[in-house]
Amino acid sequence: GIDLGLKDLATLSTGEKIAHPRHYRRLEDSLGRAQRANKHRLARTIAARIGNSRRDFLHKASARIALAHDTIFVGDVASSSLARTRMAKSVLDAGWSMLRTQLSYKALRHGGMMVEVNERFTTQVCSSCGALPKVRPEGIADLGMREWTCCECGTVHVRDFDRVRSHVARE
C-alpha cells in the first residue's frame, strides 16, 4: 500500500518513505524573477525544467514501486479539491495524479495491478482492531498529530504507516 503525502511524497507499507524533492519550490524564486522581468524565454525554460525533473523523478519512483510489488493500493486523494486550499502549491508540486497514472500503467506492464482505495477515515480507524476511538487525529486541524494511541487495544500508531495498513486491510 502507498500513502501519498506532502511531507514525504509516498509512504510504503514496507516502511520505506519516498522523499518529496519539491521541484517547484526549489526554482520558485528564479521563476518569479524571470516572470516579473518579462523574460518569457527564461521563464518558459525554468517551467520546463521543473516539469521535466518532476516527470523524471515520478517515472523512476513509479517504476521502482511497480517492479517491487504485484498489487499496489493507493488512496484516492482528491488533489483537485486540495489544490483550492492554502496547501495548493505543495499539492500541485507533489504530482499525485501523475504518480497514480504512472503506477497504474507500469503495474499492468509488469504483470501487477493498482487499486485505488477509499481514503475516508484511514488515519482515524485503528488498523489493528478496527475501532474508531474518541481520541484520534481529525481533519486539517490535527495534521500535526503524527502519532496516536488506540483507546481500545492500546496500539501506538504512526499516522502515515497506519493509513497504509488501513489501505491494505480494506482490500
Region locations from a protein language model:
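Positively charged, helix-rich recognition surfaces that bind polyanionic ligands
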Residues: 1-171
